[in-house]
């Protein structure tokens, strides 16, 4: 099974890349953690933001193969504790499909992406910076795996 983070935005600071890669390499091979970056359209003063969101959503969905699970990260999604995330991770693992965790751009996800979502997850009611979200997702996936495997990291 693969866990794939599909996120709008690229050219992250080095600390973000290092943080993401640190948690990705800690994951066992049977739960590979991957990152797919979707280029962010340049927002100018008179930008057609709705068109940009739609284009970014199309690019995100183009990375998803038929039958794969889509989980959107949304402020109004369901908040999961670490233990609840571990339960979800175990369900995903038993389902054996690739899980695509979708993170939109500054204005959020395209409605088409949300419509395809099987689950909606909220990391926090706070607005979080996109670079930090990547590391947070990586760390939480690793932490959930340690709960399932009895690894002492979570304690």
UniProtKB/Swiss-Prot annotation:
InterPro entries in UniProt: Alpha/beta_knot_MTases (IPR029028), RlmH-like (IPR003742), tRNA_m1G_MTases_N (IPR029026)
Family in the record: Belongs to the RNA methyltransferase RlmH family.
Function: Specifically methylates the pseudouridine at position 1915 (m3Psi1915) in 23S rRNA.
Reactions catalysed: pseudouridine(1915) in 23S rRNA + S-adenosyl-L-methionine = N(3)-methylpseudouridine(1915) in 23S rRNA + S-adenosyl-L-homocysteine + H(+)
Major location category of this protein: cytoplasm
Keyword Amino-acid biosynthesis included in the entry's annotation: no
Coiled-coil residue windows: none
EC number: 2.1.1.177
Gene Ontology cellular-component annotations: cytoplasm
Pfam families recorded: SPOUT_MTase
Binding residue positions for S-adenosyl-L-methionine: 73, 104, 123-128
GO molecular-function term, one example from the UniProt record: rRNA (pseudouridine-N3-)-methyltransferase activity
Alphabetical UniProt keywords: Cytoplasm, Methyltransferase, rRNA processing, S-adenosyl-L-methionine, Transferase
Record field: transmembrane: none
Name of this protein: Ribosomal RNA large subunit methyltransferase H
The organism of origin for this protein: Pseudomonas savastanoi pv. phaseolicola (strain 1448A / Race 6) (Pseudomonas syringae pv. phaseolicola (strain 1448A / Race 6))
Enzyme class at the top of the EC tree: transferase
Subcellular localization, as worded in the UniProt entry: Cytoplasm
Subunit structure: Homodimer.
PANTHER family for the chain: METHYLTRANSFERASE (PTHR33603), RIBOSOMAL RNA LARGE SUBUNIT METHYLTRANSFERASE H (PTHR33603:SF1)
């Amino acid at each position: 099974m693969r866990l794939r983070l599909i996120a709008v935005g690229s050219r992250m600071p080095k600390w973000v890349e290092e943080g993401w890669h640190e948690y990705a390499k800690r994951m066992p091979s049977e739960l590979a953690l991957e990152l797919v970056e979707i280029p962010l359209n340049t927002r100018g003063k008179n930008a057609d933001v709705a068109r940009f969101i739609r284009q970014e959503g199309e690019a995100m969905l183009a990375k998803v193969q038929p039958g794969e699970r889509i989980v959107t990260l949304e402020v109004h999604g369901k908040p999961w504790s670490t233990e609840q995330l571990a339960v979800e991770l175990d369900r995903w693992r038993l389902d054996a499909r690739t899980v695509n965790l979708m993170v939109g751009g500054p204005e959020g996800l395209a409605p088409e992406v949300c419509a395809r979502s099987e689950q909606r997850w909220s990391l926090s009611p706070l607005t979080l910076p996109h670079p930090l979200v990547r590391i947070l997702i990586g760390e939480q996936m690793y932490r959930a795996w340690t709960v399932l495997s009895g690894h002492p990291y979570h304690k």
